[in-house]
Amino acid sequence: MRVTSNNMMNSYLKDVQKNLQGMNKINNQISTGNQVNKVSDDPLKAVKIMNLNNEISDIERYNSNVDEVNGWLDMTDNALDKVGTLSSEIKTLLTSISGTFGKDEMKAVSSEVNEKIKQIGEAFNTSYGGKYIFGGSITDEPPVKVNVDENDGTVSLVFRNTNDEGKPNKGLSDNLNVSVSNGINFNYNLNINEVSNSGDAFDIFEEVSDALKGDTAD
């Protein structure tokens, strides 16, 4: 077979192109530190690498979720501790009332109790990362409305979102879930319906406040 100069040139160019591609591949491996930079380099290895990258991405997401949940739970514990402490302080104030108390002393106790009820409402409206932790799935607005009577300073707590019966709307009672591992979801919140015992706590605070108001009336 006769080899023409044209054939030789084409063969030469193919060899040069092949060598350049090989050099470019090696250069990419050196600069990126990766043996496989695209699927065509090594399809089998490329698939394995993509699978590993997906697993790494999932693990990073799970770790981020766990960190978020831990912060949320810490904030929940702090808020509930505050509610518990304030409730105990209200009980102490009430048990300190003596039959010999005059109106001024009763007004002082009433003022302290109402201030603590207000602080309990603020604790129920605790937020973490811009989300209200006791709001169920309604995380963008406080779950509790703190009403203060302008005349006598009496404080009452009510659900911000209620139905016709005065009960919290479904969103306030929702649970929040997050994925912490493959196939494992974790419910990480307490909603206001749970922590207020379906609003019974609000009723008790209101009864206490009203009773003190009656004892301090002129």
Tell what function each PLM region has.
Residues 16, 23, 27-30, 34, ...:
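Polar, low-complexity export/assembly segments characteristic of proteins
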Residues 1-140, 213-218:
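Amphipathic alpha-helical polymerization modules
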